[in-house]
């Protein structure tokens, strides 16, 4: 058995009105051994980092803290996600919603939520309202999800938002030697 270390990378934009309330966005850093991990999950890393960069570049000051987490060791058992949950156990009640990008680089066409709280329902409704003008529809299936790295947060009661993406070719590339940057 080969022992190795992994870690999470965390950065955030502190909220202006409710800095103690945390919105988590993220993706996982590791990949399957056959490919380079461009689709799974380099695309997700790029999407979430770009989202945070757009907020900063636009000079926006979010109401709540937006925390970007790039999880380590997802492919071998959600080790980074479990470590994040354990290390932030005392502040999980302040996590108002979480979302992960882990389905390639396809267009987001629908969002759904596992809101778990009235505040989560209200936040989901506001997010849906903001995304409607760019053609992203709200769904009503209200099932747990949002990406594997969110499972430990879901189990802890954190509301989640799932990005439904165009994944027509995702499983042709996922965990294969074809998961390369030219597919993005």
Stretches with model-predicted labels:
Residues 1, 18-19, 33, 71-171:
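Metal-dependent peptidase/peptidase-like ectodomains
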Residues 42-50, 78-79, 83:
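Short amphipathic alpha-helical face segments that pack within enzyme cores
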Residues 1-38, 50-63:
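Soluble metallo-hydrolase cores and metallopeptidase-like ectodomains found primarily
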Residues 171-182:
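Short helix/strand-capping connector loops at secondary-structure junctions
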Residues 34-44, 142, 182:
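Alpha-helix N-cap/helix-initiation motif
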Residues 23-26, 63-72, 97-99:
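Beta-strand segments within the central parallel beta-sheet cores of soluble alpha/beta enzyme folds
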Residues 48, 65-67, 159:
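A fold-wide structural signal in alpha/beta-hydrolase
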